[in-house]
């Protein structure tokens, strides 16, 4: 009887451990490292940096082949789902999300809005619209969690430069911002236009400041000037886009990120840029843990880190 009792208890303990492991993304016989493996991302280790509660990933995209690709699309990545993304959240420790409609879908924001509905109150959306959008549609988008519009003039498609100022005036009344994805040289060329915009500006991916000039490039000064005037924010994201050095330190683009955060920590937000759509080969995708760890050098103290990951996103996107 004693043996039977011991065996039953052992079975219960083992079954319970297996259930807990499965709930946490582990299985018996599966390595701890594999628990952090994320689709469309390289590496499998957890980041060294511990994310504070309510940390926000302010730049990512969803892809879903149930929705039509825009005729003008130059990027056509594979599916990247909410289920996939939740594995990334588990890996890096973020809980809030800003979904950016990618150029792949033109002005079709349905993939982003559907994902936001699944993620719930922890998600916001930056939409893509053109000059045919109605005021009623803008108001509808606001009720669905949209807090800004994006102009991607790197992967050109649904929007164009002549739409920026008129649409900025319209969305300003909704309390939205205008997100700009342009190369550094483009930003310098339209500096006067940017100064005229009534809505706040959010610059994608470190402002795409070119390397190897980095902070010596005129675009850095243009962006920082707008930040200093309280007119702009910067996403310290996408360190892999313009690097000439590469991982793990991304020393050249990291210098830009560090400079931006030091100059104006109250106007910086961070984003993963998952699933890294400009990197077409799955095997070449960046390691998201390494990208997240860069913040240890850019925001080296706990107060600054909390600003970048929690407080600033709450202000910019309206998280409570």
Q: Regions from the language model: what does each represent?
A:
Residues 81-85, 108, 133-136, 187-188, ...:
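Alpha-helical scaffolding within the catalytic cores
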Residues 2-32, 36-54, 79-96, 265-266, ...:
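Mid-to-C-terminal alpha-helical segments outside catalytic/metal-binding sites
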Residues 59, 112, 171, 234, ...:
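Conserved, mostly hydrophobic/aromatic
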């Amino acid at each position: 009887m004693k043996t039977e009792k011991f065996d039953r208890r052992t079975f219960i303990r083992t079954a319970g451990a297996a259930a807990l492991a499965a709930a946490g993304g582990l299985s018996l016989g599966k390595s701890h490292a594999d628990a952090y493996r994320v689709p469309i991302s390289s590496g499998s280790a957890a980041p060294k940096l511990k994310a504070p509660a309510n940390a926000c990933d302010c730049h990512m995209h969803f892809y879903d082949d149930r929705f039509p690709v825009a005729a003008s699309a130059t990027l056509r990545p594979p599916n990247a789902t909410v289920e996939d993304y939740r594995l990334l959240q588990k890996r890096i420790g973020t809980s809030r999300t800003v979904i950016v409609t990618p150029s792949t879908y033109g002005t079709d924001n349905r993939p982003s809005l559907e994902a936001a509905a699944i993620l719930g109150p922890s998600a916001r959306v930056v939409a893509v619209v053109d000059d045919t959008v109605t005021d009623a549609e803008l108001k509808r988008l606001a009720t669905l969690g949209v807090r800004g519009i994006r102009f991607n003039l790197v992967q050109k498609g649904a929007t164009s430069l002549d739409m920026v100022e008129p649409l900025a005036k319209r969305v300003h009344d909704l309390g939205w911002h205008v997100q700009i994805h342009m190369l550094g040289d483009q930003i310098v060329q339209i500096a006067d236009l940017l100064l005229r915009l009534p809505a706040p500006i959010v610059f994608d991916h470190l402002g795409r400041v070119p390397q190897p000039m980095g902070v010596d490039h005129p675009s850095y000064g243009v962006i920082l000037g707008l930040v200093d005037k309280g007119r702009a924010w910067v996403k310290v994201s996408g360190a892999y886009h313009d690097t000439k050095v590469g991982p793990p330190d991304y020393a050249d683009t990291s210098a830009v990120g560090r400079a931006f955060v030091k100059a104006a920590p109250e106007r910086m937000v961070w984003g993963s840029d998952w699933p890294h759509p400009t990197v077409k080969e799955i095997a070449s995708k960046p390691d998201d843990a390494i990208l997240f760890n860069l913040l240890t050098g850019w925001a080296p103290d706990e107060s600054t880190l909390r600003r970048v990951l929690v407080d600033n996103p709450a202000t910019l996107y309206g998280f409570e």
